[in-house]
Amino acid sequence: DIEEAVLNSQLSYLKNIRGGIFELNKNEISKEDMNLLQFIAGIIIDSKKGGISHSLKDIEEEYLEKYKKIPNESENIIIEPENQENIDILQNTENLKYYNEYGAFSADGKEYLVKTNKDNQLPTVWSHIMANKKFGTLVTQSMGGYTWYKNSRLNRVTAWENQPNFDIPSEIIYIKDQETKKVWSLGLNPMPDNKNYNVVYGFGYTKFIHKSDGIEQELEVFVPKEDSVKIQILKLKNMNLNRKKLKIVYYMKPVLGEDELKSNGYIDLKYDKNNNIICAQNLYNSEFKNDVIYVSNSEKMQSYTGDKNFFFGNGNISNPDGLKKSSLNNENSLGKKPCIAYE
């Protein structure tokens, strides 16, 4: 039995201590506590159904079956040569103030302009904060940063990598040309192409300007003075002679608390089809347990996922498998490493 196995493995010193082994009698545990234990458990092994190897086999089969559900269209990815005109907001330096190789103030001094690309990046992260009394967001020149509600440290809506030389975004807009299969990110991170990434910082707003695949892109980000909401307005203009069919995928890494790792498995995601809204709540956050975030879009969501492992697959944030699939799996994030991704 379990107690004998613990004794034989000389692990008795780990009994009933944090991070150790707890032997509990099911008959002495309330139904509510048992449900809680099963909810937060990373793995459940039932001896009535066989040994550990049998349980692991069931988990593996379930995992493989889940990832076979949606066909993968990752056949030949075509990258067309980029010969379109580039956008450079620092081109007319005579009209700018305090110009340097990275940026300058606009002629009226009300905006600060930054230009970056893969070969010319800022020596450190430039952060810009837009906030009201309850809600705020921080964005960087690479479109990194995070969002918070009520408390910027204890109640982060999305993840934050506070590193001066690494700018890993937790809120990303991916764009895919459905015909050429070319994919890029609207910000410099995490999937840059060879074009310039221009940023305009103003009082209470930020604009990201980019041109790729003959598509002019502008994203304006701001937080209203009173409302607890982050608004992003995306404008696309096709400069090609032919029509373009694009897929736009929005990705975010929800935390809804202080620690990203502690939130894993406890983010409950729900999709309201009638209102075109995805809601999420951290069931393990006692201080802000009643807070619910929502993500919506002016266009109808085609599919979504709350499963970070499904979205990344064998790839990563710079090359997620989810962008190669015809649709996402429409699954919740509960019990998994969470994300909110939709197209």
What function would you assign to each model-found segment?
Residues 1-343:
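Anionic coordination/interaction segments
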